[in-house]
A protein has these predicted regions:
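Mixed-charge, Lys/Arg-enriched low-complexity segments
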Residues: 2-16, 49, 53-88
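Negatively charged, low-complexity tracts enriched in Asp/Glu with abundant Ser/Thr
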Residues: 1-42
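Short, contiguous, helix-prone interaction/anchoring segments in small proteins
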Residues: 33-57
Length: 88
């Protein structure tokens, strides 16, 4: 997988939660100096002072890892799928 299909602009994604209301998450690409995106910062979407939800980091193969402790595995997977589609 190449980095070309990853999300390149700030976007919002709706995540479904198992035992709580869903939430909209703001996804912000973190560009490297060479223009490649390797990480995405995650925040609550509509608050004046948004809460930081962690980050998702990608390698050149399209594998990802979540760096944070707020999102469940299912929620992480929803955000990662959204990013991998490259749509926003």
């Amino acid at each position: 997988m190449t980095n070309n299909s990853l999300l390149l602009t700030e976007s919002k994604v709706w995540i479904k939660r198992k035992d709580a209301p869903g939430e909209v998450v703001r996804v912000i690409p973190d560009m490297e100096s060479n223009g490649r995106v390797t990480a995405y910062q995650l925040y609550t979407a509509f608050e004046q002072n948004p809460d930081y939800l962690g980050q998702i980091l990608f390698d050149n193969e399209g594998y990802w890892i979540y760096d944070g402790d707020i999102l469940t595995v299912a929620e992480q997977e929803q955000v990662a799928r959204f990013i991998l589609k490259g749509e926003g």
